[in-house]
């Protein structure tokens, strides 16, 4: 059997890889302009980091993690999300004594054992941003703005910002009690997943993908979480709204918005794209003031977001954003004799890295060499024949115009740099 990439994973190269690189580079520009420090965490952590941080009752922990034992018997997990690992790093490296808030960002692969579909993979890539060390609602608004700016800076326009609040723990306890009271008599009408959620975390039913569940919620007229907010959580949300309005960030309140991670408190938000189908959320985030305590540290309030690189690439494609063809070499050297092959290699090495130089690995007839240079998208072809070797020269041909010139090897770098601008 021929080896293939595992289902739900893919190799990245060419245009697709360059699109990923462009997305991450744009995020770097936006986030580092806001003072965020880049962080790179390991791709696996002790399993308890996610069990405690993400929540043992979440779908991610119960069904979607890739978990294994190391040779010492420790349970380790490939990271399914970035926030818990970034907060762990903040605690481990004593960032609490730095000037607060500490803004961090990270880009890299995440892993979830999900059913692969368009825009959703078992290995996927995220950009994460976290601001740790303050409860100020300005930071919540800043996180929304930064996510929106990352996507706008890429050129995306068909964006919808959805804002909500999941309240404080006491608010959620009241809301979960209400949901159990309303939904328990109709338990058998729920999907199998939501029957489990009814016991573990009823709020997650609001986010169910089951049409049956959504129809039942509508039929019963289930009230939104926003109706159960306490005074402090309500005031916090109002402040976030005020800041967004002051900055003219278009948003809509989404009462049914529930993030899939247990650590969220108060602010929750998502940015959706209008034209990428069922998986329309490009990214989202919220506030998580108690996460550090779940990981064994002191209380450190925080807020952040993540967006999926593959999802954003789909949105860019839907809006017609492409990338130019990959740039070919500045110079493609064509040896005309066996002896000239090594000389082509030596000259290419002398030109790199200032210039992109490639060469044929065997003698070519001029017409064949020109054909190869054109296929590679080269700006210039360089011929090395017996005459050129004897004289220590190269014949250069500009492929766009057919203009030809013969130069000493020492003159080649300067000529090409000037000609290529």
Swiss-Prot record:
The keyword ATP-binding applies. The lineage of its organism: Bacteria, Thermotogati, Deinococcota, Deinococci, Thermales. Residues 1-171, 229-320 are annotated as: Catalytic. It catalyses: tRNA(His) + L-histidine + ATP = L-histidyl-tRNA(His) + AMP + diphosphate + H(+). The keyword Ribosomal protein does not apply. PANTHER family: HISTIDINE--TRNA LIGASE, MITOCHONDRIAL-RELATED (PTHR43707:SF1), HISTIDYL-TRNA SYNTHETASE (PTHR43707). It comes from Thermus thermophilus (strain ATCC 27634 / DSM 579 / HB8). InterPro entries: aa-tRNA-synth_II (IPR006195), aa-tRNA-synth_II/BPL/LPL (IPR045864), Anticodon-bd (IPR004154), Anticodon-bd_dom_sf (IPR036621), His-tRNA-ligase (IPR015807), HisRS-like_core (IPR041715), HisRS/HisZ (IPR004516). GO terms for biological process: histidyl-tRNA aminoacylation. Keywords: Aminoacyl-tRNA synthetase, ATP-binding, Cytoplasm, Ligase, Nucleotide-binding, Protein biosynthesis. Homodimer. One of its GO terms (cellular component) is cytoplasm. Pfam families: HGTP_anticodon, tRNA-synt_His. SUPFAM superfamilies: Class II aaRS ABD-related, Class II aaRS and biotin synthetases. This is Histidine--tRNA ligase. The gene is hisS. It comes from the Bacteria. GO terms for molecular function: ATP binding; histidine-tRNA ligase activity. Belongs to the class-II aminoacyl-tRNA synthetase family. HAMAP family: His_tRNA_synth. It is found in: Cytoplasm. Its EC number is 6.1.1.21.
């Amino acid at each position: 059997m021929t080896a293939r990439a595992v289902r739900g994973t893919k190799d990245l190269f060419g245009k697709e890889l360059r699109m990923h690189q462009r997305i991450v580079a744009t995020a770097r520009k936006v986030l580092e302009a806001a003072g965020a420090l880049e962080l790179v965490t390991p791709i696996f952590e002790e399993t308890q980091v996610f069990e405690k941080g993400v929540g043992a009752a979440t779908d991610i922990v119960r069904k979607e993690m890739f978990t294994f034992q190391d040779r010492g018997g420790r349970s380790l997990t490939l990271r399914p999300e970035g926030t818990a690992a970034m907060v762990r790093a903040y605690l481990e490296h004593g960032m609490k004594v730095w000037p607060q808030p500490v803004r961090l960002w990270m880009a890299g692969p995440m892993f979830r054992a999900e059913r692969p579909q368009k825009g959703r993979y078992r290995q996927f890539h995220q950009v994460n941003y976290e601001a740790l060390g303050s409860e100020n609602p300005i930071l919540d608004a800043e996180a929304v703005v930064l996510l929106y700016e990352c996507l706008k800076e890429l050129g995306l326009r068909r964006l919808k910002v959805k804002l909500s609040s999941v309240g404080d723990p006491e608010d959620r306890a009241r809301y979960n009690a209400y949901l159990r009271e309303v939904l328990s008599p109709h338990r058998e009408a729920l999907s199998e997943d939501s029957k489990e959620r009814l016991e573990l975390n009823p709020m997650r039913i609001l986010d169910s993908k089951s049409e049956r569940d959504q129809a039942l919620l509508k039929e019963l007229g289930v009230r939104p979480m926003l109706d159960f907010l306490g005074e402090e959580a309500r005031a916090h949300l109002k402040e976030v709204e005020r800041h967004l309005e002051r900055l003219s960030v278009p948003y809509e309140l989404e009462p049914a918005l529930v993030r899939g991670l247990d650590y969220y408190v108060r602010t929750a938000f998502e940015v959706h794209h209008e034209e990428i189908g069922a998986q329309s959320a490009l990214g989202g985030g919220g506030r998580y003031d108690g996460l550090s305590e779940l990981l064994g540290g002191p209380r450190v309030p925080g807020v952040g977001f993540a967006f999926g690189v593959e999802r954003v690439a789909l949105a860019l494609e839907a809006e017609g954003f492409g990338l130019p063809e990959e740039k070919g070499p500045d110079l493609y050297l064509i040896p005309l004799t066996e002896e000239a092959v090594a000389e082509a290699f030596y000259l290419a090495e002398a030109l790199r890295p200032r210039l992109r130089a490639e060469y044929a690995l065997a003698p070519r007839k001029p017409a064949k060499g020109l054909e190869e240079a054109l296929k590679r998208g080269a700006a210039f072809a360089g011929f090395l024949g017996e005459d050129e070797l004897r004289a220590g020269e190269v014949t250069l041909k500009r492929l766009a115009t057919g203009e030809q010139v013969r130069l000493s090897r020492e003159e080649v770098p300067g000529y090409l740099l000037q000609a290529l601008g």
